[in-house]
Amino acid sequence: MPTIKLVKYLTVTAAVLTLATAPTPVAAAPEPVASEAPLQATPPAAGTWQPPLSTRGRYIVDAQGHRFRLKSANWDGAQGSWTGNGSTADPANHHAGQNSYGIPLGLDRASLPELLADFHELGINSIRLPFSNEMIHTAAPVPDAAVAANPQLSGKTPLQIYDAVVAALTHDGFAVVLNNHTRTSRWCCGIDGNERWNSGQSTPQWADDWVFMARRYAADPRVVGADLYNEVRRDVLDDPNWGLGDGHDWYAAARLAADRILTEANPDLLIVVEGINWTGLPVDGLPHGRPTLTPVRTLSHTLVNAHKLVYSAHFYGYTGPRHSGATGVGETHDPRYQDLTRDQLYQVLADQAFFVTTEGQHYTAPVWVSEFGSGAGETGTAARTWFGNITDCFADHDADFAYWPLVGWEGHDDWALLRYDTAGRRYGILGQGDWRGPAWNHLMTSATRTGYIPPVPVWRMLNTGHGDEVRSLRVRAGGDWDPGAYKAACPDGLRLTGLSHTGGRGLCTDTAAGDLRAAGNAQTVVTDERYVPAGGDWAGGYTKLQCPAGQFLIGYSRRGDRVATALCAPARTSLGLTGRTVWFDRSDNRPTDGAGGDFASGHYKGQCAADEYAAGIAFTTRLGAAAGPAALLCGPLPGLTAE
């Protein structure tokens, strides 16, 4: 993670970005190592939160609906420490001179019980636990010296040691978020062959490893999340993107992995999607920057479970909104975060990340700042001021966070909250004289919302720009209702309430009625006007796809720009037969409160009111007119209690 060594690395790589060739892929990794299954955790009686975790608006909650604020730290090492130069056997070629041997740091210096006791003393409740894909497939055991303080781990592979660490953490009451940090076991994050999830491997291979890991810990309910990939960024030649539908589309890849994890491995996991960390060339006058979560404003994820999405972002003082963190050659004249005033920093964090926590939007989700940090040896006024300002911002925003890093070696990595010497003596932020202590203590003890979080209306977008967006598992169980068409269906529990005239977007919600659908998987595919009652022409001159009486819209399909079908489901209660026509082929026609947000930026949109359901779609195929949705039939919801 970002430190002075990384800055030097970025400086060198930035200078050769336009000249270097693409990195050579490494050989394919072997199949996952057959090893003993991880221990199933038995939470201690003192545990006060009940897994699994889910989301309600901007908050993460436990199984009882109580707030669970991620007060986390990153226990790194299993993602690799080698810097990419020289022999891996030489400690000097590892970050800060610390050879992690592909396992969490500190196991050579302190026993697991001692480490966990120190973690508790910090006040954290959760651990982001990085790993590399290489770690999963490494068959060789680590040297005994790497686990000298934990001889029970002698002879084990990195994955088996990762198992033991997960089991120890969860048994002690910590929540664990698995983090796929890198592909190879190499220190992150520069031009290092680990820039994207599919650098040196295919997207299906990456997703396969995620299914493997999620299944591996599925029996441990305190393994609560899957953080899909770390700091997606430009490689030598190409940028990642958010929604272009190509092989560099991080938005689509994250959706694919989330789908597979939730449907094939563990439906209880939170899915953590980090924004894009860097695009462009860090050269004055050329496009470059740190998009972070800004693309989410116009294109957000909709998972098969509408209550499992968490977005994340990383912030370090020496990087910036358009500054890579490099020094010297390759450095631009853009401000670093630590160059910003307090007010400017607060605004930038809002613009880049915390806007996602705004309630009532299609993108509303918790935001976890899953990396930030600074060194105990930092003497710069700007860097120290930044650390105080950003921790104040987290406190003021009641944000979820994870410090980087948690554990290091004394005399090596002074960024670590806890450092241990070869005799196991502890140093760091819990001792006297660490300038970071007051800011850390303020963050850990500041006022925070606790207790029961009431359910809030959910809004989620549908996007058929590059293919199907069938988010309902009940609909999937019924098979392909319109082969060859692009299809979309709301997640189970939500109904369709809005459509765009062009672009294939939709908006789903549960507002006012909760889950409106009746039990079972019955659904109706509407392809013509057979369900339009006599005398009920609500869109004269237009083709109308109307649900049967007692049913409501949950999905749609299109062929090119033309509406193909409407997908309807029976309601759990009787629905009225009256309705109104909402036209949107010439302008937006949405409720004045803007609920759900702009789910189809740049396109005309129509949307039923919060106390209505959508019962039909009208469109035209006349020459010169767009054949997309032109009107919705919106009917009044009966007096329902949200479920």
Model-derived segments and their meaning:
Residues 29, 36-126:
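N-terminal carbohydrate-binding accessory modules
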Residues 52, 95-104, 108, 198-200, ...:
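Extracellular glycoside hydrolase catalytic/binding regions
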Residues 379-459:
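Aromatic-rich peripheral "rim/lid" segments of glycoside hydrolase catalytic domains that contact
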Residues 85-91, 95-100, 133-158, 186-201, ...:
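Surface-exposed, active-site-proximal loop segments in enzymatic domains
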Residues 63, 73-78, 130-134, 179-183, ...:
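Active-site-proximal beta-strand/loop segments in catalytic clefts of secreted hydrolases
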